[in-house]
Amino acid sequence: MKKYLGLATLTTVAALVLTACGGGSTASTDSSATIDPAANADKSITLWLAGGDTPDELRTYLTDTFKDQTGATLKIEEQGWGDLVTKMTTALPDPNNTPDVVEMGNTQSPTFTNIGAFADISDMYEELGGAKLIPSFVEAGAVDGKNFTLPYYAGSRYMFQRADVWEEAGVDTPTTLEEFNTAVKTITEENPRDIKNFSGFFLGGQDWRNSVSWIFANNGDLAKKEGDTWVSTLSDPDTLKGLAQIQDLYRNASKAPSDAKDATPWLYINDTDQILDDEGEATGKTSLAAATIMAPGWAHWSIGDLAKQDGKDVREWNDEKFSAFVLPGNDGNPAPVLAGGSNIGISAQSQNPDLAKELMRIIFSAEYQNLLGENGLGPANADYNAALGDDQFAQAAIASASNSKLTPAAPGWAAVESSMILEEFFGKIRDADDLKALAEEYDAKIDPLLNLK
């Protein structure tokens, strides 16, 4: 998930949260049997949801079910991804202003769990799903074997192609990573429709979240823990193999700008589209400029022919034009991709921990997990993956998620992302004459950020 925060702000996270939270509290172990709806009529708790990924249908289910089961009121407040960390830093230490339950990006979780911002919910782990919960997300929310946040939902990345353009270029869907790299370079060279600045694979110059798949596929990583210290690994030999492939794609398959990130790549695979600002106002137009993009699974709702539904513009998927497939790895199995999604936890300063735990029970219930899947969000509990369906998007999502990875669980990882240093590094790869020297330069810049607490 996207998270941006000024570095100076993030370095104060630990001080602010530790001042109020100490080492992190333990949520009450009282069961739902102690909840008296009549006694809770005047009580309320607040849930922070990040961005708009949770559909209105699910929000209504949460508020209605919470009211029915507890008698209390659930207030849902949506927080933008751009300032979520800043708001968490300010609100979580303050018992008078803290939200009771918080959704955060899975890569943000380690920063806050390591400094006591969330209550210990280890006593609920088995009840909420136990080993069926997404392991990498559970790990991101754990400290010293204790659980502080758990998975909320998962989203996996896969490839969307203009099947018609691939066919016109005479290129088949690849079965290995090498075949994919060759295919998109060939399509760029063939450019069957003679489109200006055409990309066989649109990969933004600063798009590290998708590019990292090539690093993972070559057994590299962004960082690793050595003893008690985290170190950046951009210059490790295996990582450099992946970076060399990325550089080749930047130079020979993608005409994306060197400062383009991972936002809205579908604008370039649709026949026509609009560039919208934060308020939803159109600021420009795009036309077909790429044969392939990589994006989270929910992007398929933004891909297709333009149609009208209830007087509104919608995208209608067209199997004759579009297709989805999993990025293949070197061995033909799904390549490792960066998992998207969120974790969720109870604030250590919540004044209503029992009610907060009731909300967690509702979120991890079979009913809600199935609702997540039915709305295209990967359930936290693998038992409910069938709710995703069996169409090409569900199949790609499940296959892609089977080999997904998270960013390093370093306490300062949010500082790395917020500093935009990875965007800066990847933006220099295309024109780098010495990848190893560039990687070593940025290893030295990233190392101190990784260990911020």
Model-derived features: positions:
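Conserved N-terminal structural module of periplasmic/extracytoplasmic solute-binding proteins
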Residues: 4-10, 14, 22-111, 319, ...
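A structural signal for short loop-to-beta-strand junctions that line the ligand-binding cleft
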Residues: 91, 98-100, 129-164, 199, ...
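Hinge/lid segment of periplasmic solute-binding proteins
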Residues: 36-39, 106-157, 214, 317-325
